[in-house]
Structure formats: structure tokens, C-alpha cells
UniProtKB/Swiss-Prot annotation:
The gene is WDCP. Residues 576-604 form a coiled coil. This is WD repeat and coiled-coil-containing protein. The keyword Repeat applies. Transmembrane segments: none annotated.
Amino acid sequence: MELGKAKLLRTGLNALHQAIHPVHGIAWTDGKQVILTSLHLHNGEPKFGDSSVVGQFEHVHGLYWGPGPPDAPALLAVQHKKHITVWQLCFNAADRNKLLVSQICDISEPFPVLPQGCVWHPKKEILAVLTTRDASVLHSVHLNNCRIKADIKGSGLIHCACWTKEGNRLVVGVGSALHSYIWDDTQKTLNACTFCPIFDVGGYICAVEATLNFQIAVATELPLDKICGLNAGVAFEVPASIETESFPSQSSLCGEEEYSMDGGKKVLDAEKPMSAVTSPVDLTHILSSKPGADSSPLLHLRPKDYLTGSGQDSSHLILVTFEKKVTSTKKVSIPGILVPDIMAFDIKTQTVSVASNTCNVILVYSLTSSNLPNIQQIQLEKNEKPKGLCFLTNKLLLILVGKQKFTDPAFLPSSRSDKYMIRLMIKELIFEVAPSTSASVNGSCASVNGSLNLSNIPHDVSTDVHPLSRGLLIPDRAALQSPTSRRKLIEEIKSPGYEQSCLLNMSDLKEKKVSLNFPPAVESLNAEPLNQSASLSTTSLAFSNKPTSPKRQIETASKIPNSYKNNLLSEKEASYFSKNVEKLSGNFTQLQHHVCELTELLKAGKRNLPMYPSSQEPSFINITCQKQLSRNDSDERRSVILCEGKLRLSVVQQIFNLSLVEMQHGSSWIVLTADSEGFVPLTFTSMQEVVVRDASMKGYSARSSKTLDIISSTEGCRHSASESLDITSSLEVLRDCSSKALDGSSPSEQPSSKV
């Protein structure tokens, strides 16, 4: 459904959060007006009705329906820049078609209200209001001065908040920590949680959403500050023995948390003194501990990787369960979305949809499995962004899509809002009882020439095609992960069209050669469920010498177990993986042979076999090479064969030992050149006479010019019709003509001499 033009916030907005009322329909805004659009479900299918404008303001950033029974007057919170107004809507008792709207509350704030700064209590008319600095609870919207502020510890900025499902706990996202408060409805108090007041999730919080009774879902953004420059000054790792014996540790130098390679976080002991290092540390006295090293004072350092395997290389979806004894978490990475600031939850299917105001990808995760698999992707157009998400039913996801005009990425936007063409889109979610595990749990990754982790192959049931789903496979490097990249690697082999292609080594592609003896492309295939690996021998995984049928169906992705007890593979599962991997290897071999055959056929087809003439009737020309203008030098004559009427210049140069060749054409000389194939760019006829000479000799230029002058002056005396005369014949003609001229002019010259 097209809604038209709207001016909405660029980031942090979920325009469909608490935006649907069972009676009044969808509340949405174009930035100034408050508009209601009727929505009904007819046999499970949503039907949109008429729209009506119920209010107009200078700025409208968000609309939120309050809780309550359908037959009671509805409460609508309208979020503006620095204040919030609460309106009551009800139908006229006499005329059901007439809607009565009245304001019951106006809440002003010293700071701008957050994009999702209005959070209604799930069961009661209690409203939580959020700014960047304050979080307060309005326990009665009919009274303006009944707010209770939350005691926010620390100096971080507030970004979002949510009530848990039972309504007893308010969780506020401040920086990278969750601040938990217990709401006492009887005494109207808001107190910090006693057993877990502050819980750090390890990443900057973008959005929170209540899921089950004591559980919330948290989305954290990609830590660009840590990637770009957190530990830029410390680029190397020092051996542990040297580090402990010779100089202060990395953590004591930096005074911050350190993330090790295995993903564990080393928290500094608060009781240990933090030694501030203000001068350079002398390391020249430390000798290398490498066996067989020389005595030179050199350190063997290696680049230190703070991100790979530490969970800091992507945004994350985290489930936090608040319990009295322990606060537990589950974590999965969100590939392709840098700032996941939109979330929606469906309690029936226990699925969470995650999106971003700045990315055209929507991911759907299932919370029923312990691995939090990504079950579907929704791909929007390149210039479209999701501006709101909510579940209509357990299978229908309502999306507010904003289409943005092209903006120059070189210039950062200067305002919090932007103009969009907005529309409502309904997407059906497909649920299958299918095995799946998360492709990005614990940062595991697959390699083409290394090992392929089959335990982390996700199962995607979406019909949407997303660029991330294809994956980028590079030899000797990790594959860029996506929720469906590994399953696609197996799925596409099933289709007959994919049998025409296979993965080739990059060096073969560069040289455009395919070897007949294919080495195994996969050296070892490991099943690694959460850092617990069950290795399969490389001998059983080697490619079979006998090619298998290309019609063979591979059933690897659909038979992967759905859950792993204690994250370990049983022997039966390991043998099952081994059999399927052998099938996969055999099909790879067959595909490689097919590619080899196709390559050879293409090479053979490109060869244009010329039709050569018979040896009894060869096609050749006679070439005469003129030497120096002296009686001792004689011209050299050779017959050279033609190639389809073309003459190869290098052959002429080699025969007559010439570096630069020029050919006689009438009374002129033409310097010969060669084309890209080495032929003279001229065609010759069989038995043609050609005269050439060395064009690099300077003696030719003077003598040839005099010779041409002599030939042209005696042209009337010559009786020969030949176009090319050598020097000897021209001199003979000159003598004859000169003697005749002297004989004819002698009588006339004598009288004149006498005079």
C-alpha cells in the first residue's frame, strides 16, 4: 500500500512499534500529520481500508498505541522533538462513524526525545519516556506531574529501553550496558535490580525488545571504534615468557579489556595497581627465545589480532535472561547489518526480525533453537530502507518501507530526518522443521582450500535472494560469511544447471589453464560444533578416481542434525558426515572433469585451421634485394612463400640480414612495417616481383636521388618500359643518349665558338 511522501527520522526509528490498534488500525505519520489507516484480517489476509487525518503538528517523530481492551477509549502517544502528547480516541456514542479526539497529557523534556523514546507498559497505562540523559516513568498519563526518574549510573548515553513481558522490569540500554530496574506498581517506585543492576553485553546497544517472561533480545552494532583505532598503537604480540619476565603486560599498559584469540574476555583485576607508562620501554636487552636463534637482540613479534574470534568483528543479537541466581545470555552475529536498530518479536513462533534504518536487508531469527538460526532473509531494493517492523500474525510481517532519493555518499547528512516515499509491505514468513545452525556462532568460517565446517551450515527457507547469501569464496582465505553462504554451496550442486560449473583454483583462472590431473580441492573437512572438532581423515575424503554420475542427488544440508547435545557429535553423526562428504567430493571430481572437457572443446573450437594450397602449386613471390651502388656488390634474389597472400616481415629481414626494410613502389620507396601477427600489412599475388633494400643505410639516399634524377632526365631517350632500372642499365642509357646529343649539337656549336 502506497502512503506517499513523508519526513522521517533517518536512524533509530521503528515506526510500526506499538503502532497497530485492533479497532483504529495503523497509526502513521508523514512528519507533520497523524493519520489512521484501518486494517482488518479477512480469513488471515490483511485488508487495508480508508485513511483519515486526526491531527496536525509542527513535528511528529513517532506514534504509539497504549494498552487496553478494544472497547475502551484508546490512548495514543504522539512523540515530538522535545515533548510528548498523549491523546484519547473514542467513537461518539450517538454516531459510530464520528471519532472524538482529546488531549489528556503533555510531557516536556529538556533534551530531545529518543527516536523510540515512548515505551508503553505491556498491561497498564504506564509510559516510559527516554531522552539521551534521562529515563522516567509516568505511572498515570492523566496526570502530568507524576513522573519517577530512573537513577542512571555512569556517563553513557541512553539509546533504547523496553519493559519485560510481565511488566515488572524496565531495562534501559545505556552505552554497552543494560540497566535493570524493578517497578513496584503498589508503591509506584522504580528501583535498581538487586541481583543484576548493570549487565555489560560487550557492544554498543542499538535496540532492545521483550521476548519471553524474563528474557529480552538485544541488538548491538559493529564496533567500528575498536576496529579502526582502539589498539592501533599496539600492533604486535610478544611471547608470554618475555612479556611476564621483562616488561609490563599489554593489559597493564592499556588499562582496558583485552580480547584473546579464543573469544574469551580477560577482565582486569580491580585490586591490582594500574601502572601508567609515560616513557618508552627499553626492550633491547631481551633476546629471542626462538630455538636456534642468533645472539642479536631481536624480538620475534607477530601481528596481534584483537577482532578475529573475539566476537568484535560484527554486530550481534543477544538474548539476556534475568534470573535471580544467574543472568544468562545467548549470542549470534548479524551479518551484513552494521547498526541493527529495528527489532520485532512474535511470541507464538518465537521469532525475532532484525533490520536497520540504513540497510536494505531484514533478517529473521528463530529463538526455539539454542543456536538462534537465521531462518529467512528479506531483500529490499537498493534505495529502499525499512523504517518499521511488526508482526501482524505469526506468519505475516508488516514492513514500512521508505524509498529514498539518491544522495551523494561523499556528504554526510546534516539533519536527523530525511524525506522518503513510504509504503506498507507484507511479507509472509515460511517456517519449516528443518535442521539449522547459525553460520556465525563463535565466528566460525569456511575456507575453500582449507577446511569446510559442515556443522555451521545454516538453513534458509527464504525465497528472497540476497547478495550476502552467495558468499565470497577465496582460496586460502576465509569465506565472507552470510546466513546462507554455506548451505548455498551444497544446495546449488543439486540443480542440474550447476553441474556445468565448479570452483577452480585462482591460479588456474589467471593462466586460463585447467590441468587434466585435478588435485583434491578439499584437503580436509572438519565438523566443528562450537570449538569441538571431530576431524575426518583426509584419505577417506580424497576425491575418487572413478567419476560418479552427475545426476546423483546430495542430501547433506537437509539431514544435518537440528541440535547438538552438549555441543558434541556422536560417532553415528560423524560417520554420517563422512559419507555425505565423500559424495560431495565425488561430485566435485565429476564437475571438474566436465569443466576440463568443456575447456578443451572451447580451445579446439577457437583454432581456425587455414586451408593451405597444394605443394605442387605454391604461392610465393620473388624478392630482389639491392645492395650498395658499386660494381663489387650484386643484387640478391630469393623466393619467399606467402601465407594467404601475406608476407612475414621477419623472414625478409632474416634472409637479407636487414634491420629496416623498404620496398620499391614505382619511383618511390616505402618502409615496411608489421602488424600484430608479424605480417606486412599488404597482400601480394603469387609470382609477383618485389624489390627491397636496406632502409637504414644512409648511402642510398644520396645515390638514389641522383639516380632518379638521371633516370627522369633521360626518360625520353629510354626505350625500355620497365618500371625498375638498376644503376648499370641507367648508366648505359645515359652514355648512349649523351653521345647522340653531342653528335647532333657539334655543327651548331662551332659557329658560336668562333663568334
